C-alpha cells in the first residue's frame, strides 16, 4: 500500500510535498510511473494536467527537476510539486443557448445541436460549445488548463445529441477514466444506406488519419498509426433501401461510427465526406447521426446518471420520408 505525506505551508501555497513510502515493499522500485502516481495522489488533477506539470518542470524529485513522466518511482523518493494558477483561456464567453439534459456542481450534459463545433480551432475561433459553456459556467475556464476546458469527449460538428462536460478537475479525471475503462455507455442512432444481412454485429478495426486525405479518417493498421476502434451495432428498422441502426461505442475515435459504417458497406445518409451525396428530399445538416443516450457513474455520488437526447426534427423527418417511400 502506498501512502503519502503532503505538507502545505499555507492554504494559498502552490507547492505540495509528497513522500513516497510503502508498507511491505522492499527498498527499491515500486514499479509505478511518476505521472500515474501523481494523478492517483492528487485526484483533483487530471492525468493530462499532471503530465503537463511534469513536462513544464513543475515537479522536483529529491531536489532535482524531473521532466520524465515515465520515470519509475522508488521507495523514499521525495517529490515537490508546484501547482501554479491556471492562465485564463483566450476564449470569449458567448451567450449561445444550451439545451441542458442534466446539471449539478460536478458536471453538465447538453443536447448538442447540428452545426455547433465543440471547441475553438482553425476556422472556428468562436461560436462553439466551449464559448457557450464559459458563459453558462464561468468557473469552467480553469478546468483542464487547455483550450477545451472540461471537455471529456467530442461530437462532430453535425452530429447531434448527448455530450458530457466536467465542471471540476475531479469530475474531468473521473469521467476520462470511465471512458477509458469502458464503464460509460454511449448509444447513437444512425440512418444508413442499404440493409445489413445480420440484425447485429461488431466492427473491430483500427481507425487513423487517412493517408491520402487529411480531412478524413480511415481503417489504418496499428503499425501505421491506427488506434483500436470497436463499434457494436444492431438493426432497429429496415426501411426500403435504408436502415435505422443503433451504435454502441466501446472506444471513441474521431469519426469512428462514420468510418465503421462505411466499412460495413452502409455509410450514413447525409455524410458527404465518406460517401457520394445522395438526394433524400429532406434538408439534412449533415450525417444522420444522433447520440441519443449517455449513461455514466456520477464522480461523487456513485449513482448511475442516464441522459436521453430527444430525436432531432430533421432525423424524424427523414424517417417519416423514407417510410412513406416504401411501396
Curated annotation (Swiss-Prot):
GO molecular function: pseudouridine synthase activity; RNA binding; rRNA pseudouridine synthase activity
Superkingdom assignment: Bacteria
Sequence ranges assigned to domain S4 RNA-binding in this UniProt record: 32-105
A GO biological process held by the record: enzyme-directed rRNA pseudouridine synthesis
The name this protein goes by in its record: Uncharacterized RNA pseudouridine synthase slr1629
EC number in record: 5.4.99.-
Keywords: Isomerase, RNA-binding
Keyword Isomerase found: yes
Record has Glycoprotein as a keyword: no
Family according to the record: Belongs to the pseudouridine synthase RluA family.
Entries under InterPro entries matching the protein: PsdUridine_synth_cat_dom_sf, PsdUridine_synth_RluA-like_CS, PsdUridine_synth_RluC/D, PsdUridine_synth_RsuA/RluA, RluA_PseudoU_synthase, S4_RNA-bd, S4_RNA-bd_sf
Major enzyme class: isomerase
Enzyme active site: 156
Catalysed transformations (reactions): a uridine in RNA = a pseudouridine in RNA
Amino acid at each position: 500500500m502506498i501512502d503519502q505525506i503532503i505538507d502545505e505551508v499555507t492554504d494559498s501555497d502552490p507547492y505540495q510535498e509528497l513522500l513516497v513510502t510503502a508498507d511491505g515493499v522492499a527498498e527499491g522500485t515500486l514499479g509505478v510511473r511518476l505521472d500515474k502516481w501523481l494523478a492517483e495522489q492528487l485526484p483533483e488533477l487530471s492525468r493530462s494536467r499532471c503530465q503537463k506539470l511534469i513536462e513544464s518542470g513543475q515537479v522536483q524529485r529529491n531536489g532535482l527537476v524531473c521532466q520524465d513522466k515515465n520515470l519509475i518511482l522508488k521507495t523514499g523518493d521525495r517529490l515537490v510539486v508546484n501547482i501554479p494558477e491556471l492562465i485564463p483561456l483566450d476564449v470569449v464567453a458567448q451567450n449561445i443557448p444550451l439545451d441542458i439534459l442534466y446539471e449539478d456542481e460536478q458536471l453538465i450534459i447538453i443536447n448538442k445541436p447540428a452545426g455547433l463545433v465543440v471547441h475553438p480551432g482553425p476556422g472556428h475561433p468562436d461560436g462553439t460549445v466551449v464559448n457557450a459553456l464559459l458563459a453558462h459556467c464561468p468557473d469552467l475556464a480553469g478546468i483542464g488548463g487547455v483550450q477545451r476546458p472540461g471537455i471529456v469527449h467530442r461530437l462532430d460538428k453535425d452530429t447531434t445529441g448527448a455530450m458530457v462536460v466536467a465542471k471540476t478537475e475531479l469530475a474531468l479525471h473521473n469521467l476520462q477514466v470511465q471512458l477509458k475503462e469502458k464503464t460509460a455507455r454511449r448509444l447513437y442512432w444512425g440512418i444508413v444506406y442499404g440493409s445489413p444481412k445480420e440484425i447485429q454485429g461488431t466492427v473491430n478495426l483500427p481507425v487513423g488519419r487517412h493517408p491520402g486525405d487529411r480531412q478524413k479518417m480511415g481503417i489504418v493498421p496499428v503499425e501505421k498509426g491506427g488506434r483500436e476502434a470497436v463499434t457494436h451495432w444492431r438493426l432497429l428498422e429496415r426501411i426500403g433501401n435504408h436502415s435505422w441502426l443503433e451504435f454502441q461505442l466501446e472506444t471513441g475515435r474521431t469519426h469512428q461510427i462514420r468510418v465503421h459504417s462505411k466499412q460495413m458497406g452502409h455509410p450514413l445518409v447525409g455524410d458527404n465526406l465518406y460517401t457520394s451525396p445522395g438526394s433524400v428530399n429532406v434538408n439534412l445538416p449533415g450525417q444522420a447521426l444522433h447520440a441519443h443516450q449517455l449513461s455514466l457513474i456520477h464522480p461523487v455520488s456513485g449513482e448511475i446518471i442516464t441522459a436521453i437526447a430527444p430525436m432531432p426534427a430533421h432525423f424524424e423527418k427523414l424517417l417519416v420520408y423514407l417510410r412513406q417511400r416504401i411501396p
